Curated annotation (Swiss-Prot):
One GO term describing the cellular component: plasma membrane
Family: Belongs to the Casparian strip membrane proteins (CASP) family.
Membrane protein topology class: Multi-pass membrane protein
Alphabetical keyword list: Cell membrane, Membrane, Transmembrane, Transmembrane helix
Compositional bias annotation for Basic and acidic residues: 1-18
Residues in compartment: Cytoplasmic: 1-29, 106-112, 189-196
Subunit structure, as described in the record: Homodimer and heterodimers.
Transmembrane segments annotated in the record for this chain: 30-50, 85-105, 113-133, 168-188
Organism superkingdom: Eukaryota
Name of the protein described by the UniProt record: CASP-like protein 1D1
Amino acid sequence: MASTDKPDRESIKSEEAPAAHPRRSNYSSVHVALRFLLFAASVTAVVVMVTAKQTKIVPVPGLPISVPLEAKFSDSPAFLYFISALSVAGLYGILTTLAAISIVLKPAYATRFLLHFALLDVLMLGIVASATGAAGGVAYVGLKGNSHVRWGKVCNVYDKFCQHVGSSIAVALFASVLLVLLTMLSVFSIYRKIPK
């Protein structure tokens, strides 16, 4: 006769059913979306800046002649640096988008990737912000001029060129904000993984 005081093994196993999987956070999908937006913003800023070109017939002061003068992005080293930096940011954006997708598929390596993301995001933020500031400084002088050193405005003549440059800088500022958000999200995600 079997004792009724001891529970059988099958009932113990059924009572110790595995806990439901914890609800998966949306951080991974937000990472993917923000990184893709970084890629799109960087490429857009580069394309808009590269297409910044305009030719105008400008009168020569003191002479009764007019000559065609061209304004293009390649005339300024700051704009060339801007193109280079945002191109690197675009490449970084697509590579980290693919890495973030791999984290969604295999979350085992998430902490290691998040640490690298946080460090590289700060580095990219510095590069993009410095390039945006350099291009913005040149664009501001083109828009307002500088009477102290007798640099005249050029945006009153090359309006389409200045609109392209201004739009490109605005999109680059958006990319900088995205990098700030990505840095904060990566650090917060790492913080949440610290055992309490």
